[in-house]
């Protein structure tokens, strides 16, 4: 039985298409403790969002399905429970903030109706208006009663994102997964949403998994971070340790490619190439076609995960440059 709030072990989520099998998530391990913020960072197409969908049981099926691994929540394997029990956990115990509010908010239904559906599903119809207004107040929406009676198209992008956050927090879940919650917003609003998430997490004492390609966002909001590439985790450490002392060449490349006002005179570093086709992933280390440190063994064998830190302060890396 897991000692963590959430523990994902060797998770594999594949998509079976007419052209072949897509290894979207291919042996992922990570954990989240109570009252902790954990980041998952990587380029688009690395499997971050599909990892989140796997955890909350929303993998599009067909063509996708979880083909291996375990997802322990409070010691119970979510991959083995029936759909009706998973629906009771989703939203009430584990909630998700999606990245595009206009995709996940119905434009022709009032805000209070959309938030009220979640309450009705888990708690019945009692005190819906009070609960909706309280949730909107929690995310600092001005005039919450007016907003509750309005429609999504009447709100700005930042306000719509606040509504999605309110929807996720409506039933006071123990774990919230935020999937690129600031992607569609301008920089000023991004900062406001990030600060809001940090404040609310402390107020309601919930754990957070923050998925992003933005290294600055992860550094600002998280305690630990996992680096994901081509369906696998390649590095894991406390945020400060990873940013100050990256081990995997992919992590190093991500950090060097991030813009910094302190280094505006230098040429911007890039990672050459692109994320591989997960229908036919590279042999050995999946980063080897793009890696400046590539050795023959990197092409031949998948590197094991090695802890270069301690049990209390792990710094795990999967790279043949490190042999323990």
Language model segments and positions:
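Short catalytic/signature loops enriched in Gly
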Residues: 4, 142-148, 236-324
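Conserved ABC ATPase "signature" region
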Residues: 77, 127-146, 198, 255-256
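Conserved ABC ATPase signature
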Residues: 150-155, 159
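A short, proline-enriched helix->beta-strand linker immediately N-terminal to the Walker B motif
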Residues: 170-174
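Conserved ABC transporter NBD signature motif
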Residues: 66-77
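P-loop NTP-binding/switch modules centered on Walker-like glycine-rich loops
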Residues: 43, 177, 181, 185-266
């Amino acid at each position: 039985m897991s000692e963590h709030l959430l523990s994902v072990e060797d998770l594999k989520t594949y998509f079976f298409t007419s052209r072949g099998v897509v290894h979207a998530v291919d042996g992922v391990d990570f954990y989240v403790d109570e009252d902790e913020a954990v980041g998952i960072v990587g380029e688009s197409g690395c499997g971050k969002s599909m990892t989140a969908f796997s955890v909350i049981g929303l993998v599009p099926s067909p063509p996708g399905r979880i083909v291996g691994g375990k997802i322990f929540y409070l010691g119970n394997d979510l991959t083995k429970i029936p759909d009706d029990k998973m629906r009771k956990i989703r939203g009430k115990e584990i909630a998700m903030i999606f990245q595009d509010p206009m995709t996940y908010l119905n434009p022709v239904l009032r805000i209070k109706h959309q938030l009220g559906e979640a309450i009705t599903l888990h708690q019945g119809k009692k005190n819906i208006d009070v609960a909706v207004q309280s949730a909107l107040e929690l995310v600092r929406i001005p005039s919450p009663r007016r907003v509750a009676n309005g429609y999504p198209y009447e709100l700005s992008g930042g306000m719509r994102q606040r509504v999605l956050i309110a929807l996720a927090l409506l039933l006071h879940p123990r774990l919230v997964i935020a999937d690129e919650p600031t992607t569609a917003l301008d920089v000023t609003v991004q900062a406001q949403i990030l600060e809001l998430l940090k404040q609310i997490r402390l107020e309601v004492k919930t754990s957070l998994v923050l998925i992003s390609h933005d290294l600055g966002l992860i550094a600002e909001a998280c305690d630990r971070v996992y680096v994901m590439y081509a369906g696998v985790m390649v590095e894991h450490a406390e945020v400060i340790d990873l940013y100050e002392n990256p081990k995997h060449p992919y992590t190093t490349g991500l950090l060097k490619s991030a813009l910094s006002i302190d280094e505006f005179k230098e040429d911007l570093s890039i990672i050459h190439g692109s994320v591989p086709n997960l229908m036919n992933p590279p042999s050995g280390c999946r980063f080897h076609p793009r890696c400046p440190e590539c050795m023959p063994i990197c092409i031949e064998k998948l590197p094991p995960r090695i802890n270069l830190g301690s049990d209390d302060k792990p710094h795990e890396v999967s790279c043949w440059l490190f042999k323990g």
